[in-house]
Design a protein with these regions (language model features):
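Secretory/organelle targeting and membrane-embedding segments
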Residues: 1-136, 141-460
């Protein structure tokens, strides 16, 4: 086992929803691949014992992909359980005993951020945070710039930055982290990937469903906090970053941070927020809620490559389709011969199926001198054999590969950009279910308009 590989996995919140839906299925997948062979220690305050946690693990697997008999048998061999409160130091003393000689444990905090400080401090006090230990935390990394800085101070008090793993499972999606490879490995593409040739970039993350019973959580977040500040900024970083000088994790993360440092902080004229009609009647939602379920934003990246190129992001719930994609619209060709020639574009779809397509002009065979836009599909796959995003990020976290994870400076720069427009800093507009957001969002529209995603033959 290498010095970067952890020698024990501890996950707090072992009886919770995240463990049930994501962690146990990821553990089984890792065991099947041969990438996990260390003690797995669950910690929670539920009055459970090991047998009941094992039953919970089996039930999780039955409802999320199925039980692999051999892999589940191995999970049972590796699994331990400590029942106790996070405020009780005795819980952590028991954890220390259970860890035994482990010197590089990974502590996964699958718990609310309000408990992070207590758990991290007790880990250190009980001797569970030796120099080789690491701590894994889930997004959200704070609620704004001030809380993100406070959270980082808590973590850095007992762990060095190299030992802090900030997980955003979205980066585990293969199409997201393959964007840079596509950019720099294709000589047809990279030379035009700059302000000289790109007119604008648009990112869409649309969902055709609502809050799905998560109203109480969603009403504390909203679209900007929930997906734009993290998921979509990560996509943007991969699109806009410079090719790193080396392929090590720090070189790649350095370039991503440079992108965020180049983005102007958002102002009121750069954002339109919306809320779908009926949101305030959802369970757990305040009847006077000012939380957005839709947002459209315009960004400017003041780097040499992207100076003057507007970048548009929109995301929301109960929109016409469920789809996440990027479209880069190239500058319009000179109108010398054919006045109706439209700008070319590159479309990079992340979900529901990964797809790369190019929009080109061709001459209409039915009308002389008239062109039409056609789309060439360069790559398409449904990702049936693709590793689950949680499995990917958890595997990398345990192996010590930090490439996909947000660094302290990245997190704080992302919050800096959105901080001025959080909460009720801008007006909230109502929109109808199945629409592309409120009418005022037309004020934040790319040149030439949005290219709406087409899924299953319709964009509605």
């Amino acid at each position: 086992m290498s010095d970067s590989q952890c020698d024990a996995l501890v996950f707090f919140g072992a009886t919770g929803d995240l463990a049930y839906k994501k962690i146990f299925p990821s553990l089984q997948a890792m065991i099947k691949r041969g990438t996990l062979n260390v003690p797995i220690i669950g910690v929670a305050k539920s009055g459970w014992n090991l047998d009941r946690l094992q039953e919970r693990a089996r039930d999780s697997l039955e409802h999320h992909g199925g039980v692999d008999t051999a892999a589940f048998a191995r999970i049972k061999e590796l699994l331990r359980y400590i029942d106790g409160g996070y405020e009780d130091i005795e819980t952590f003393n028991n954890l220390k005993k259970t860890l035994g000689e482990a010197s590089r444990p990974a502590h996964y905090l699958a718990i609310p951020p309000t408990l992070f400080a207590t758990v991290v401090e007790h880990l250190a006090a009980a001797g569970c945070a030796p120099s080789g230990a690491r701590v894994i935390v889930e997004k959200p990394f704070g609620r704004d710039l001030a809380s993100a800085r406070a959270l980082n101070r808590i973590l850095l008090k007992n762990f060095t930055e190299e030992r802090i793993v900030r997980i955003d499972h979205y980066l585990g999606k293969s199409p997201v982290h393959s964007m840079l490879f596509f950019r720099v490995s294709n000589s047809l593409h990279e030379p035009v990937w700059s302000r000289e040739h790109i007119e604008s970039i648009q990112l869409t993350m649309a969902e055709d469903f609502g809050v799905q019973g998560r109203g109480a959580f969603y009403d504390t977040a909203g679209t900007i906090r929930d997906v734009i500040q993290n998921h979509l900024f990560q996509v943007l970083s991969n699109l806009a970053m410079e090719p790193p000088a080396r392929t090590d994790s720090e070189s790649i993360r350095d370039e991503k941070v440079k992108v965020l440092k180049s983005i102007r902080a958002l102002g009121p004229d750069d954002v339109v927020r919306g809320q779908f009609r009926g949101y305030r009647e959802e369970n757990g939602v305040a009847r006077d809620s000012q939380v957005e379920t839709f947002a459209a934003v315009r960004l400017w990246v003041d780097s040499w490559r992207w100076q003057g190129v507007p970048i548009y992001i929109r995301s929301g719930k109960l929109l016409p389709v469920t789809c996440t994609e990027m479209v880069a619209r190239l500058r319009r060709p000179p109108s010398i011969l054919y006045e109706n020639a439209q700008p070319n574009y590159l479309r990079f779809r992340i979900s529901p199926a990964a797809e790369i397509a190019i929009g080109l002009n061709v001459l209409d065979s039915q009308e002389t001198g008239v062109g039409q836009t056609t789309e060439l599909i360069a790559s398409r796959h449904a990702g049936a054999n693709e590793r689950d995003a949680y499995e990917r990020v958890l595997s990398d976290a345990l192996a010590g590969d930090r490439t996909l994870f947000a660094r302290e400076d990245y997190v704080e720069e992302a919050w800096r950009v959105v901080d001025p427009v959080l909460g009720a800093a801008t007006a909230l507009h109502t929109y109808e279910r199945g629409s592309w957001g409120p009418a005022p969002s037309a004020a934040v529209t790319p040149p030439g308009g949005w290219i709406d995603p087409i899924v299953n033959g319709e964009s509605r």
